[in-house]
Amino acid sequence: MDGAMSDRKVHEVETDVAIIGGGTAGLNSAMAAAEAGCRVLIVDKANIVHSGAIAGGIDHFVAYLGTGPSWDTREAYLGYVGRVARGAADLDVHDAVYCDELDAALARTEKIGVSLRQPDGKIFRTQAMGQPGPYFINFDGKHLKPKMAMEVKRRKCEILNRVQVTNIYLHDGELAGFTGYDIRTGDFYRIRAKAVVIATGNTNRMFNAQIGNPFNLWYCPANTGDLHRAAFDAGVALANMEYVRMTIVPKGFSAPGFNAFFGMGARLVNSLREPFMKNYHEMADKAPRNFMVWGALQELKEGRGPIYMDCRHLKPKELEHLFFTLGIDKDTLPEFLLAKGYAKEGAMIEMTVSEPMQARPSELCGSGIRIDRNCASNVPGIYAAGDASDQMGCLHMAMAGGFAAGKHAAAYAKKITHLRPLDTHAMAEEEARVFRPLERRSGITYREFENIVRIICTDHFGPVKTELSLTGALEKLNRLDTARDELKADNMHELMRAHEALNIHQVSKISARAALERRESRFHPYQYRADFPQTDDANYCGLMVIQKQPDGAVTTRLDKLKYAA
């Protein structure tokens, strides 16, 4: 047993609005709730200064700016969302949580000390991913996350760093609070709140990584579905959980950079030096991400690999800007490319398809807690924002939608006259469950357990899937249930990893079940059913909603979505 356990304390905490997850969406939610005059508590598994998907920085913000062209308007943007994220994006929600909040989000970014402009004072915009015009504002967001952390501290938000949330509790069907523990000291927290915003991102480490290391991923490896699982167990409805997302990355280095490359005009070519994306989408290298991945997979499957990012036609100034931008998300990516022999001039950079992850099928929606126009779930008092929700993704939605979630959570909290009770017996049971892996002298390590989950997911639905592969995955994943009670941990760090592994396991089952129920292919290859290879708008243009009922049964339904065309 870890030596710190003998000093473990139990803390009782009360607040108006609790924010679970201190990434971009969570911190913007906290700003809004504090601005509304609520007591705000931020709980983060890491440290809010550098945590979440943009912990290392970010270089793009999607926005329409109303500069004059027909594509640069609210209406054109929503039309674009409807085309590119058809069947996954609820335009009514987007209109409320993004469009209504966009101007304020842009102003807030500048106000906290991060300029969206280039050194010459101009806004530089690029076009990629199926956009009708250059919606990407290219900027230096290296210090955006620390600046947001400073802002929530300035607004007097209470912060609990290094606390992993373990479960959510209701009282008479409404939020009562949640539990968690300090991943360093083992202190246990019982937290009561009038409202909570869940902003803990998507689920990673579910599939085999491109380079073998499950922590060297395109996306944040600390996002392990912790609150997707906890919310699901509390009866919160989830949506868009069936999608398996991938991107194009440098061979040997999973890193962001897709839109930087294509926004600057780079193009994908096969080993015959042929640009191939024109064969898969009319916009060629400006196509939506899923088409780019689909095209790359087909070229590799048909023997025309490896694939390359062709930058030979870019001008010296464009290359200089590109390599600077690539270092904003991950400092070492430019160094890696140069060390591999890719000179800045005349570069032909070998690329590949990244590892899959359970996440949104488009930059224009999310995957997770089903939200309405108020960012509210089906459970009173529980709200969601960012990648943890079914309608938000990327910086633009995390900034705008995160703030919207905080506003609505605060408005709800102000109507609640008293905190709801946490059941004493349930608290004791949860504390015992959380620390039980530390008491086991022998058993399974988190690495062994998690690796088995990854193998099953990769083999059965990462990304090609059929009814047989999905039912087989569920059978194998269900057989792992008994092994959950055998996980052991030798210290607090391993305890955290054990709970992450357990959450990844549960989310993998949720994802497989949702994919099984969607008997069509959509956003190829993110939901590619080899037994149903066509998109079926007549029957499946909508959100696959999955929910655990009070009796423990898991149910699904399709919430149909309507679009102008």
Each language-model region and where it sits:
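Glycine-rich loop(s) and the adjacent beta-strand/alpha-helix scaffold that form part
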Residues: I198-A255, L395, M399-H408
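Conserved redox-cofactor binding core of oxidoreductases
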Residues: H50, A105-R192, A199-Q210, R245-S254, ...
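Glycine- and aromatic-enriched mobile tails/lids
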Residues: D2-R8, E12-E14, A36, N47-V49, ...
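N-terminal Rossmann-like FAD-binding beta1-loop-alpha1 element of flavoenzymes
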Residues: V17-I42
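An anion/pyrophosphate-binding glycine-rich loop and adjacent beta-alpha core
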Residues: A230, V236-T352, H408, K414
